[in-house]
């Protein structure tokens, strides 16, 4: 059997660009370098860090978490540990926001993404808070969007926006539910926050891991009200349930979206899709042709 390669040597690539289990990826670009992290549950060292120069060739360079500061993790705990993290770069430091669904939201920081990373610092002690993503706003305010795990707190389909202390990055105000996807975007989760041209954007997967889709929310005010648009779904493609991921902009100005696909026994593999803009909405495709969701 031929060895799988992502770079097919004609200026093109093939998906998945990470044909292995890197669940719940988030990614950023700093200068000429891209960095990606993913969840790892109770595997330790955890929350792997990958590096790339081109979004296609990736190399693992370290881990954000050496140990979890709770005795229960001395033994494997199925479905627990580090869930979907977020990676951000602010004022010369890398920040990884990491949820533990039974204990709360934590962050770790580093000046070098290869490490060392600091010990975990508690942002919010809570059961059922998951999938955090911070946003440093232009006026110095810091916010964190997150979802909920129904298995822990009985809440589902909702995105909450909390305000953080700019110095400690701890929650100072839980804040409102800014989006309720119960009717139109069930299982809304995995929020990733961005700001562009005065718009606040929250990218969310919905519909569940196996057969879901990618939705984008946008608003002029960080607290909403948020409009919603489905921007990518499976359609007639073989890529089931294009799930949560990250928007990155390349040095040449092109936009890209990394997301995972659940391949069952192969794990959650990572795909790379081109992204473009029309009327301040992102569309996950090479060229905008219509407002219909892309595949």
Predicted regions and their residues:
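Blade-edge beta-strand/turn elements of extracellular beta-propeller
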Residues: 4-17, 58-75, 108-126, 165-186, ...
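Beta-rich catalytic cores
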Residues: 21-23, 83, 128-131, 187-189, ...
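Hydrophobic core segments of beta-strands in well-ordered, beta-rich domains
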Residues: 28-43, 82-101, 106-107, 120, ...
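Beta-propeller domains
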Residues: 38-64
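Structural motif
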Residues: 45-48, 104-106, 154-160, 211-217, ...
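Active-site neighborhood of glycoside hydrolase catalytic domains
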Residues: 147, 160-163
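Repeat-solenoid scaffold signature
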Residues: 233-278
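Conserved small/polar residues in nucleotide/adenosyl-binding loops
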Residues: 288-294
């Amino acid at each position: 059997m031929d060895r799988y390669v992502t770079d097919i040597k004609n200026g093109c690539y093939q998906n998945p660009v990470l044909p292995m289990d890197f669940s719940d990826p988030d990614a950023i670009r700093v200068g000429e370098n891209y960095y990606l992290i993913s969840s790892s549950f109770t595997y330790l060292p955890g929350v792997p860090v990958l590096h790339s120069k081109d979004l296609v060739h990736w190399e693992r360079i370290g881990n954000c978490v050496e140990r979890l500061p709770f005795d229960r993790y001395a033994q494997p705990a199925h479905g627990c540990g580090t869930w979907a993290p977020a990676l951000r770069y602010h004022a010369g430091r890398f920040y990884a926001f990491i949820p533990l669904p039974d204990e709360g939201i934590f962050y770790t920081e580093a000046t070098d993404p290869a490490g060392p990373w600091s010990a975990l610092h508690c942002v919010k002690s809570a059961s059922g808070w998951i999938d955090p993503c911070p946003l440093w706003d232009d006026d110095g305010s810091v916010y964190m969007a997150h979802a909920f795990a129904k298995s822990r707190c009985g809440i589902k389909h909702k995105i909450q926006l909390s305000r953080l202390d700019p110095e400690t990055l701890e929650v100072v105000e839980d804040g409102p539910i800014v989006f309720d996807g119960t009717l139109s975007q069930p299982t809304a989760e995995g929020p990733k926050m961005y700001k562009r041209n005065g718009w606040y954007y929250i990218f969310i997967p919905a519909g569940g891991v196996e057969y879901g889709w990618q939705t984008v929310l946008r608003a002029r005010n960080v607290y909403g009200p948020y409009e919603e648009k489905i921007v990518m779904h499976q359609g007639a493609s073989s890529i089931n349930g294009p799930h949560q991921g990250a928007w990155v902009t390349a040095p040449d100005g092109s936009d890209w979206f990394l997301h995972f696909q659940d391949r069952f026994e192969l794990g959650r593999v990572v795909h790379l899709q081109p992204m473009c803009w029309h009327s301040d909405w992102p569309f996950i495709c090479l060229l905008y042709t219509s407002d219909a969701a892309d595949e």
